[in-house]
């Protein structure tokens, strides 16, 4: 048994920004009290990981990225009660401690124990469980899934159905839940409403699915890559528009298409100009615009405050507004009951050592979700 021992395994280490991943042998320490060591089976490639490589999301280096995954518990530290060795689990980049003001509120989901920003990039006790070539390696978002084994705090891991296919449900660890929940939980899209979704990547398509599940009558997909339109329509978009096809600003195009603007708009890209456009494209008085894409570090947004004065609501959504430890097992159960699909989001499945190819597919717009298998 490996319990209580250091495990040597393969991991994708990012030694510095704007460089490819390096597959290295790392040492993964055993879990301390209230920690869980997990063998990762499948992990998705998400734009947020690429944001660290590009410098949009500022993190310390060297680091093991990855936050959308599924695996099996290898061993647990002292005092862990919610999971046991052999359990199938999904790591949670938004933990749920159950004790902080946010966890105790019925409204929020961004547990105070999160390590998204500003990030320590370490375990909650301020230390790392990874070493490589004698150097401590940083964690990412309390998850670090681009490795055969990782260590998570018990508050950052959810036990799921033992029959769940891990190479599919790993998307519930980030991309799918983030988009689907932005529509259902954050915006609370109503039946018969009109929606616009800016950005039709994996998360944007999940927003489309959430709008459809909520009963929206019109769902307009907005993307500069028209190759994304067929899949968007397959998943529920009623119209798709490419801003490049128009000389006028996209919010004016959407206003003309809908009369007074959409009831709900979603920015799922992470660009300040599209955030402002999404706000301007929703109904002047009761429109709701939701920021889902990760905003770039150190950028400011300028917009006409009259857009809000007239009554619009502007809000953000992290992990789809779901309280993670409570909701992830339920979302997996819903998937098992075929209440939604994940297959159309997974365009590529690659062996783990091809991680750099997977990121190239993301950057060139050739993939929606690539899943890496160990």
UniProtKB/Swiss-Prot annotation:
Q: Which InterPro entries match?
A: ADH-like_C (IPR013149), ADH-like_N (IPR013154), ADH_Zn_CS (IPR002328), GroES-like_sf (IPR011032), NAD(P)-bd_dom_sf (IPR036291), PKS_ER (IPR020843)
Q: How does it assemble?
A: Homodimer.
Extract the Gene3D superfamilies matched here.
Medium-chain alcohol dehydrogenases, catalytic domain, NAD(P)-binding Rossmann-like Domain
Give the residues the record marks as binding Zn(2+) 1: 46, 67, 174
**From which organism does this entry originate?**
Struthio camelus (Common ostrich)
What's the name of the protein?
Answer: Alcohol dehydrogenase 1
Gene Ontology terms for molecular function: all-trans-retinol dehydrogenase (NAD+) activity; zinc ion binding
Main site of residence? Answer: cytoplasm
Q: Report the top EC class in one word.
A: oxidoreductase
Requisite cofactors = Zn(2+)
SMART domains the UniProt entry points to: PKS_ER (SM00829)
Where along this sequence does the record place binding of Zn(2+) 2? Answer: 97, 100, 103, 111
Q: Which UniProt keywords apply?
A: Acetylation, Cytoplasm, Metal-binding, NAD, Oxidoreductase, Zinc
Q: What are the recorded Gene Ontology BP terms?
A: retinoic acid metabolic process; retinol metabolic process
Pfam families cross-referenced by the UniProt entry: ADH_N, ADH_zinc_N
Q: Name one GO cellular component term.
A: cytosol
Compartment(s) where it occurs, according to its Swiss-Prot or TrEMBL record = Cytoplasm
Q: What is its EC number?
A: 1.1.1.1
Instruction: Determine if rRNA-binding is one of this entry's keywords.
Output: no
Give all N-acetylserine modified positions: 1
Question: What is written in the cofactor note of this entry?
Answer: Binds 2 Zn(2+) ions per subunit.
